[in-house]
């Protein structure tokens, strides 16, 4: 059996043998904040998430909105709705886990198929993106599970000291 067929057989068989390897779609329930550390919220699995109450978003969701619209919306469309040459992240994030998101943004990705080529550039060296990966992830996760509507969040929590300290450290300030 050649290596390509073997890889395909493994990819098809592993989820059958171990159903936990199949990533199920994210939902508001899975994304619910169960813990908080200096203004950053986490779900039951310890993955960064959002907290939106009475129309007020946590700082990281708001920051993610700002950072997304600074660097990502040019290709992926406003509010993650996609464009003619980049996928709708508000849709694809429903089935993308946190490590995969971090890897794709940091390292980039190239998809070629059906006569079409899509290239996601690597942003691992761009501090304006890399220093805010959690924020962008949190914002897109909120959009993916319909917790955050389109447009600028009307109200936001204050910027926590932990966010200020991390930003200064990451940006070199």
Where are each of the predicted segments found?
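Extracytoplasmic/secreted proteins, especially bacterial periplasmic and envelope-associated proteins
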Residues: 59, 63, 67, 84, ...
């Amino acid at each position: 059996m050649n290596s390509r067929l073997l890889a395909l057989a493994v990819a098809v068989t592993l989820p059958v043998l171990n159903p936990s390897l199949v990533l199920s779609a994210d939902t508001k329930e899975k994304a619910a904040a169960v813990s908080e550390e200096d203004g950053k919220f986490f779900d039951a699995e310890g993955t960064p998430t959002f907290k939106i109450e009475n129309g007020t978003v946590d700082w990281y969701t708001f920051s993610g909105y700002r950072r997304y619209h600074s660097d990502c919306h040019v290709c992926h469309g406003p509010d993650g709705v996609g464009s003619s040459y980049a996928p709708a992240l508000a849709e694809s994030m429903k089935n993308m886990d946190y490590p995969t998101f971090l890897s794709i943004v940091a390292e980039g990705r190239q998809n070629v198929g059906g006569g079409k080529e899509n290239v996601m550039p690597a942003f691992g060296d761009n501090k304006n993106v890399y220093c805010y990966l959690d924020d962008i992830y949190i914002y897109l996760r909120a959009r993916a599970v319909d917790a955050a509507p389109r447009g600028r969040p009307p109200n936001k929590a204050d910027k926590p000291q932990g966010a200020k300290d991390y930003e200064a450290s990451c940006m070199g300030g």
